[in-house]
Amino acid sequence: MLKIVLKALLIGKKSLTLQFKAFDMKKTILIAMSSAVLLFSSCAQEYNRVYKSQDYTYKYEYAKECFANGKYSRAVGLLTELVTIEKGTENAQESLYMLAMSEYCLQDYESAAQYFKKYYERYPKGYYAEQAKYYVGESLYASTPEPRLDQSPTIQAISAYQDFIDVYPDSKLKDQATRRMFELQDKLVIKEYYNAKLYYDLGTYFGNCTSGGNNYQACIVTAQNALSDYPYSNMREQFSILVMKSKYQLAKMSVISKQMERYEDAQDECYGFLNEYPDSKERVTAEKYIEGCKKFIEKHQKDPMYVPQI
């Protein structure tokens, strides 16, 4: 009986100890949370005091501290005012650069591009001029859309990088800027491919051909322009496939007076494709088209209805 009582007392003691430990843990957490709230409140009060201050030197130093510690939102709030108030002073140049970089770090790339551009325009010989010129391109690069969308921002980014390379041909950032340009050009190539492929897929549909012509002709023009504009693209074969297929389909749907000429053109295109891409996955298609063109030409080459009149 005594053993049972002692065991019960021991269990109770352990339970009480655990309860005290749990209480101490909760107390520690509450103290930590309270301290964090007080610290945040204190920091917020300090920021508000600085923000309302007319001591612009103090405000500038506080903004630099915020920037250095990664508190970019607070830095922006102070620097936006300082770049106007301190215009023409020693601190104005660094304030504008920190503002631009803060916006960049906050992923407000449109504002960042504007401020970096403004910095370079105001201080073309400034301490951060090279970085600012480069980050105009970086800001535009970061905001470029995926290839299916309008690529105007992509063209602007390419132009910005090219401007940077022209102004700083010996910069350590030149190679990175060049890589960015090639990457963005690839995006333009993909956009052109989507456009050409869309025309091909629309095929004989005329609802979108309000200015005459047809979708196969539009596909051919778009793809050939891309081949001319981007001669080193790794998508040359894809564009060539679209040209070949479109020329064959165009010949099939043409009026009698144009069919012979277009079948001959399609046949030449297929031969050219096989010469350039002998191992293409579309080799069988090209050979099939050549056979179709030959049959048509042999059948109608003496028929005056199909032979163009000179």
Annotate each PLM feature:
Residues 6, 11-12, 17, 22, ...:
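Acidic, polar-rich low-complexity tracts and alpha-helical solenoid repeat scaffolds
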